[in-house]
Amino acid sequence: MAKMLKFGEDARRSMQIGVDKLADTVKVTLGPKGRNVVLDKKFGAPLITNDGVSIAREIELEDPYENMGAQLVKEVATKTNDVAGDGTTTATLLAQAIIREGLKNVTAGANPILIRTGIKMAVDKAVEEIQKISKQVDGKEDIARVAAISAADEEVGKLIADAMEKVGNEGVITIEESKSMGTELDVVEGMQFDRGYVSPYMATDTEKMEAVLENPYILITDKKISNIQEILPVLEQIVQSGKKLLIIAEDIEGEAMATLVVNKLRGTFTCVAVKAPGFGDRRKEMLQDIATLTGGTVIAEELGRELKDVTIDMLGTADSVKVSKENTVIVNGKGDSNAIKERINQIKAQIEETSSEFDKEKLQERLAKLAGGVAVIKVGAATETELKEKKLRIEDALAATKAAVEEGIVAGGGTAYVNVINEVAKLTSDVADTQIGINIIVKSLEEPVRQIATNAGVEGSVIIEKVKNSEPGIGYDALHGEYINMIKGGIVDPTKVTRSALQNAASVASTFLTTEAAVADIPAKETPMPGAPGMGMDGMY
């Protein structure tokens, strides 16, 4: 297929138009007085949201060069969302600022490769300084503040803090839609591991692409199942009992998987298969954890057990199991409570004995899954549109809270970026174009405060100067229009979110500046519809 080409300044400017279109749409949502964006949906009601990554994902531009620019910045939002779960609007805004300042200098003749070196130096220094001013999360109150700022709702903050208190920092918190108007917290004991179904055809809810099994049997084995004959005796017993089955195995493939999928599609029998979590010896231990929790037996060769000999009383059971593409949650396993306590004490003893930090971390995870549980936040609202918007905000708040527990918190409202400007500005380079790269980051670090102020209807430059000349930690509270100590006032951002947003924005933006040519498909011309043929009655009146 023939291609269109653009070079140099022409290519970069076309792509920058796309960057600006996407970033200008996203950045109106930043801060406590940020607005919402309405997204048209092919099916159902429009979605109203202020979630940066949800907005970015919806944007496709007609012009291929503009679209390239938009897709590059979309990657900034997506990557930040994947790493930190929040901060996508800030990341998009920073990328736009770095690209804008960078292009001015590249157009004036600066070398983009040297500019990129300067950008990297400045970002590394900024991240180092952000980590220095970071404060560890201290108790329930700090958690509530982080969540409340992210969701712009104090009630949500309290709810997430309660959830984390009940299941622990390593516990599992899921968000579901409620059938009532209110938002409430429901804590159920359960275990989650990061393995999803082996085939999407096993999903029972095709809209959410999840498989939900109520009161199922659970077959736990470290073997690979490829021949259906191996598990046929126990399958026949389960079909007669009318229950569903979850298989946790090393792998399930070939004829065995095909048979299970076909039976599921025909409605004969519902079975979901997932791969066993972990690797090596850790996998054996995790399978034993699941067996203890559900009251089942691990079918393993080293224990002298074969699949063909499995009977129903060797299977585990639970109130419910939810399996998505990536995760499995077992809720209310029917294992013996004394056996579970014994297993928990065993893991605690191993934690005390081990000297390896990695092993300790993995043991803590296992302990949380056995002893913690699953907290479910049920989101309610008057309309479906409000419900979806609220759910997105709570998802962001939960991700922000987890990030805060991981790496700590810094002053919010863009204040942390302004606080590190002086240290970053001290960086110098003998190479003029590298120094330009450093200066670009120094200027771009002001952008989040400027945009929060603009969205609140005040002049950003005035706010930035005031914050720069104040003590570190003093920032602008856009909601109340006053200067306060941000951490004491509860306006905080997770360090991980603040750091990731800057790193991802700089990574994509500095690569963007080195672009010298752009190649795109020539749009296909629409062929006009042929005219209707004559009726064979020419000349008649």
From Swiss-Prot:
It is found in: Cytoplasm. Belongs to the chaperonin (HSP60) family. It holds the Pfam family Cpn60_TCP1. It comes from the Bacteria. GO terms for cellular component: cytoplasm. Keywords: ATP-binding, Chaperone, Cytoplasm, Isomerase, Nucleotide-binding. NCBIfam families: GroEL, PRK00013.1, PRK12849.1, PRK12850.1, PRK12851.1. GO terms for biological process: protein refolding. It comes from Clostridium beijerinckii (strain ATCC 51743 / NCIMB 8052) (Clostridium acetobutylicum). It catalyses: ATP + H2O + a folded polypeptide = ADP + phosphate + an unfolded polypeptide. ATP binds at residues 29-32, 86-90, 413, 477-479, 493. Its EC number is 5.6.1.7. This is Chaperonin GroEL. Together with its co-chaperonin GroES, plays an essential role in assisting protein folding. The GroEL-GroES system forms a nano-cage that allows encapsulation of the non-native substrate proteins and provides a physical environment optimized to promote and accelerate protein folding. It is an enzyme of class 5 (isomerase). GO terms for molecular function: ATP binding; ATP-dependent protein folding chaperone; isomerase activity; unfolded protein binding. Forms a cylinder of 14 subunits composed of two heptameric rings stacked back-to-back. Interacts with the co-chaperonin GroES. Its main location: cytoplasm. CDD domains: GroEL.
